């Protein structure tokens, strides 16, 4: 498409993780294995929660939703990355690029809200155990989950709509392994300052809000644990919160660097490594973390395995 003497680009080239021919097949096999483990692990966790009536409580409904979001994030990025590792044609259209970014951003924002909601759930479970069934009902849980997914959808849609104001005319090379928003801004012919400001304000606000929710919730949880005199109660509290706290710690580190640190301070290599950790590594770790550190999940899994052995 042309506008005067300027050709507007509608197709882009993803540089991918590496252009070293000797590394592409080993990386393909590695990430294919990780992706299969991610999908099987997260969908298996969802199936386990769905099939066990004892796990039909808010805590595990949130966990099942987290497993779905992790599988979604990985599926939004990894299949295309695997294809590009073996393909000589690394082209992607602008519309496909926006769809991929929307899918990824929807999952990322939803997980952000979800981790904050899960922290509040842990706070109620530990600090107000007698009132937990009254406060955290399944009805409230479903309302919270609907709000979380709507929030993720609207935030992602907002950024995609603002992407439409940008034009691309100089370079069609995206130095990344998927269509992320910052690399697109870097090759835009239109001044992306407004878009960058919105990313900083909106993404930063969401992260600050959810991080504060997590910090306040776990500060109150810690005070409650310190008042406990029963060793069994302390162990149960740590069992309830430990997996979620570890998951939160792994999640927010790379995310802060990806979207809050100014783009001028990030290198392409650093950005890709942060994205790789967030889109590939965390989704495969979460079901392992929650399965190994949660007694009810492990007990339910053992029962299912014993029935089929």
Swiss-Prot record:
Any one cellular-component term (Gene Ontology): membrane
Stretches assigned to the Extracellular side: 1-28, 78-93, 166-198, 261-271
Record-annotated membrane-spanning stretches: 29-49, 57-77, 94-114, 145-165, 199-219, 240-260, 272-292
Family classification: Belongs to the G-protein coupled receptor 1 family.
Entry annotated with the keyword Repeat: no
One BP annotation, GO: sensory perception of smell
Keywords: Cell membrane, Disulfide bond, G-protein coupled receptor, Glycoprotein, Membrane, Olfaction, Receptor, Sensory transduction, Transducer, Transmembrane, Transmembrane helix
Record: glycosylation sites: 5, 186
Pfam families the UniProt entry points to: 7tm_4
Ranges facing Cytoplasmic side: 50-56, 115-144, 220-239, 293-309
PROSITE patterns per the UniProt record, alphabetical: G_PROTEIN_RECEP_F1_1 (PS00237), G_PROTEIN_RECEP_F1_2 (PS50262)
Compartments reported by the entry: Cell membrane
Name of the molecule in the record: Olfactory receptor 5H18
Annotated disulfide bonds: 97-189
Reported function: Potential odorant receptor.
GO function term, MF aspect, one: olfactory receptor activity
Membrane topology: Multi-pass membrane protein
SUPFAM superfamilies: Family A G protein-coupled receptor-like (SSF81321)
Organism per entry: Mus musculus (Mouse)
């Amino acid at each position: 498409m042309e506008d005067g003497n300027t050709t507007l680009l509608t197709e882009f080239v993803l540089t991918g993780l590496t252009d070293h021919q000797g590394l592409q097949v080993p990386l393909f096999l590695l990430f294919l294995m990780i992706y299969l483990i991610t999908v099987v692990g997260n969908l298996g966790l969802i199936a386990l929660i769905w099939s066990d009536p004892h796990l039909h409580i808010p805590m595990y409904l949130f966990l099942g939703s987290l497993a779905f979001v992790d599988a979604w994030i990985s599926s939004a990025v990894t299949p295309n990355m695997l294809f590009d590792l073996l393909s000589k044609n690394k082209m992607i259209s602008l519309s496909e690029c926006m769809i991929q970014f929307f899918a990824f951003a929807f999952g990322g924002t939803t997980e952000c809200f979800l981790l904050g909601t899960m922290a509040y759930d842990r706070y109620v479970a530990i600090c107000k155990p007698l009132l937990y069934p009254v406060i955290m009902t399944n009805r409230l849980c479903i309302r919270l989950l609907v709000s979380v997914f709507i929030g993720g959808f609207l935030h992602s849609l907002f950024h995609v709509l603002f992407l439409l104001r940008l034009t691309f005319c100089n370079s069609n090379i995206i130095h990344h392994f998927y269509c992320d928003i910052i690399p697109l801004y870097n090759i835009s012919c239109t001044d992306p300052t407004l878009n960058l400001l919105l990313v900083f304000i909106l993404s930063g606000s969401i992260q600050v809000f959810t991080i504060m929710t997590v910090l306040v919730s776990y500060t109150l949880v810690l005070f409650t644990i310190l008042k406990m005199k029963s060793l069994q109660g302390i162990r149960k509290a740590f069992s309830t919160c430990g997996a979620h706290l570890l998951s939160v710690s792994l999640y927010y580190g790379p995310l802060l660097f990806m979207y809050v640190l100014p783009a001028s301070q990030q290198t392409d290599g650093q950005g890709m490594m942060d994205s790789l950790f967030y889109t590939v590594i965390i989704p495969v770790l979460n079901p392992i973390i929650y399965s190994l550190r949660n007694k009810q999940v492990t007990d339910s899994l053992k029962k299912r395995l014993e029935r089929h052995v």
